[in-house]
């Protein structure tokens, strides 16, 4: 049975021309115990030009991240095209259909949620969230975008994960947040 990141929270935010993504560090084995508190579920790929965050089975998420990076190379860094092509092969391959993970991918201009059922979703409001604490983080991010307009996208993402961590028992406060302003 693969180890799952079901109990995780990932959020991506576009605000005032900035894009940022954040995730917590908790890995829960089933619903029984915390296996690790410092996992890195948000990372840079494609020479730092793309940020990817994942929820789901650890092995499956790494497999999909690798396939996504190959698609990025194949399509010269075109995030939308790479996302659509990954979703096509993910949905069309019986072995890949068994993978249990979701990805959020972003570059400096756009972001997408990519799932195994073939969805590639771009948000209307510049916010995407996945994982067990995703709805809590999403609500926090929406409030921040509306009422704390001076806050950076990266700070909003961190705060949203921390709010989720206050509510969701499967999300911790070991937040990794990345943006495109600096190498983290």
UniProtKB/Swiss-Prot annotation:
GO terms for molecular function: metal ion binding; threonine-type endopeptidase activity. NCBIfam families: ATP_dep_HslV (TIGR03692), PRK05456.1 (NF003964). Keywords: Allosteric enzyme, Cytoplasm, Hydrolase, Metal-binding, Protease, Sodium, Threonine protease. It comes from Pediococcus pentosaceus (strain ATCC 25745 / CCUG 21536 / LMG 10740 / 183-1w). It comes from the Bacteria. One of its GO terms (cellular component) is proteasome core complex. This is ATP-dependent protease subunit HslV. Protease subunit of a proteasome-like degradation complex believed to be a general protein degrading machinery. The gene is hslV. Signal peptide: none annotated. GO terms for biological process: proteolysis involved in protein catabolic process. Its EC number is 3.4.25.2. Coiled coil: none annotated. It catalyses: ATP-dependent cleavage of peptide bonds with broad specificity. The active site is at 8. InterPro entries: ATP-dep_Prtase_HsIV_su (IPR022281), Ntn_hydrolases_N (IPR029055), Proteasome_sua/b (IPR001353), Proteasome_suB-type (IPR023333). Belongs to the peptidase T1B family. HslV subfamily. It is found in: Cytoplasm. HAMAP family: HslV.
């Amino acid at each position: 049975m693969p180890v799952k990141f079901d109990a995780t929270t990932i959020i991506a935010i576009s605000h005032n021309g900035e894009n940022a993504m954040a995730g917590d560090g908790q890995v829960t084995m089933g619903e029984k115990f915390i296996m690790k508190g410092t996992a890195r579920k948000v990372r840079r790929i494609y020479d730092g030009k793309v940020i990817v965050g994942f929820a789901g089975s650890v092995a499956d998420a790494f497999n999909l991240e690798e396939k996504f990076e190959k698609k990025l190379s194949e399509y010269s860094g075109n995030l939308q095209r790479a996302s659509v092509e990954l979703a096509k092969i993910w949905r069309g391959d019986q072995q890949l259909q068994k993978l249990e993970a979701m990805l959020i991918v972003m570059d400096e201009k756009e972001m997408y949620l990519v799932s195994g059922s073939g969805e590639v979703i771009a948000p209307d409001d510049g916010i995407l969230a996945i994982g067990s604490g995703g709805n809590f983080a999403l609500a926090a991010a929406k409030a921040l975008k509306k009422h704390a307009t001076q806050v950076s996208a990266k700070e909003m993402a961190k705060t949203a994960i921390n709010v989720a961590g206050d509510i969701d028992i499967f999300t911790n406060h070991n937040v990794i947040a990345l943006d495109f302003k600096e190498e983290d």
